[in-house]
Swiss-Prot record:
Component of the mitochondrial ribosome large subunit (39S) which comprises a 16S rRNA and about 50 distinct proteins. The keyword Cell membrane does not apply. PANTHER family: 60S RIBOSOMAL PROTEIN L12, LARGE RIBOSOMAL SUBUNIT PROTEIN UL11M. Belongs to the universal ribosomal protein uL11 family. This is Large ribosomal subunit protein uL11m. It comes from the Eukaryota. Keywords: Mitochondrion, Ribonucleoprotein, Ribosomal protein, Transit peptide. GO terms for cellular component: mitochondrial large ribosomal subunit; mitochondrion. InterPro entries: Ribosomal_uL11, Ribosomal_uL11_bac-typ, Ribosomal_uL11_C, Ribosomal_uL11_C_sf, Ribosomal_uL11_N, Ribosomal_uL11_N_sf. GO terms for molecular function: large ribosomal subunit rRNA binding; structural constituent of ribosome. It is found in: Mitochondrion. The keyword S-adenosyl-L-methionine does not apply.
Length: 203
């Protein structure tokens, strides 16, 4: 190998150190993308990361999305800092839904009460991002309400068990009809024009 080639390889080699932020699901860290290649470029053992992350989250319900910071040291070892579940996870759990609205602003995917929002805010107030800046609870509440809006979740003052059950029943009927419509549209679509499906569903 020429001296120039060795210099070029050295220059292209990713630097060790730094912090990688990602959302990783509890107990489900795997060597593949998107995190695997990023860690590999830093010289970090992705298999070791997966083993350590999955071990640290073994007592948490599998699949819960967890904000994770990976502090990479100069010797290419690392430290993990695993945060609490995301706001969107808490909101969807409180609303009893798996996904947000397909068309935000045009449909309501779920309902949560203000009590739910304040409970989530009190939990998230312990997050480093909020705690270190001493963010007021009222600001966290507003942030959560904004997240709810983006998911198509409506925040109401009060919400009884019966009201929630009635809404969920109505929502299930809506989703079933939507699924049928998508299937019908898909049968009519030319295979070369997949984008048309999303356009027609929004109309």
């Amino acid at each position: 190998m020429s001296k120039l080639s060795r210099v070029t390889r050295t220059l292209k080699k990713p630097e060790a150190g730094g912090v990688i932020r990602s959302i990783v699901r509890a107990g489900q860290a795997i060597p593949g993308p998107p995190l695997g290649p990023i860690l590999g470029q830093r010289g970090v053992s992705i298999n070791q990361f997966c083993k350590e992350f999955n071990e640290k989250t073994k007592d948490i319900k599998e699949g819960i999305p967890l904000p994770t910071k990976i502090f990479i040291k100069p010797d290419r070892t690392f430290e993990l800092k695993i945060g609490q579940p995301t706001i969107s996870y808490f909101l969807k759990a409180a609303a009893g839904i798996e996904k947000g609205a397909r068309q935000t602003g045009k449909e309501v995917a779920g309902l949560v009460s203000l009590k739910h929002v304040y409970e989530i805010a009190r939990v998230k107030a312990k997050d480093e991002a909020f705690a270190m800046q001493d963010v007021p609870l009222s600001s966290i509440v507003r942030s959560i309400i904004g997240s709810a809006r983006s998911l198509g979740i409506r925040v109401v003052k009060d919400l009884s068990v019966d009201e929630l059950a009635a809404f969920q029943k109505e929502r299930a009927v809506f989703l079933a009809a939507q699924k049928r419509r998508i299937w019908q549209l898909r049968q009519k679509l030319p295979k070369s024009d997949p984008n048309l499906l999303h356009s027609e569903v929004r109309d």
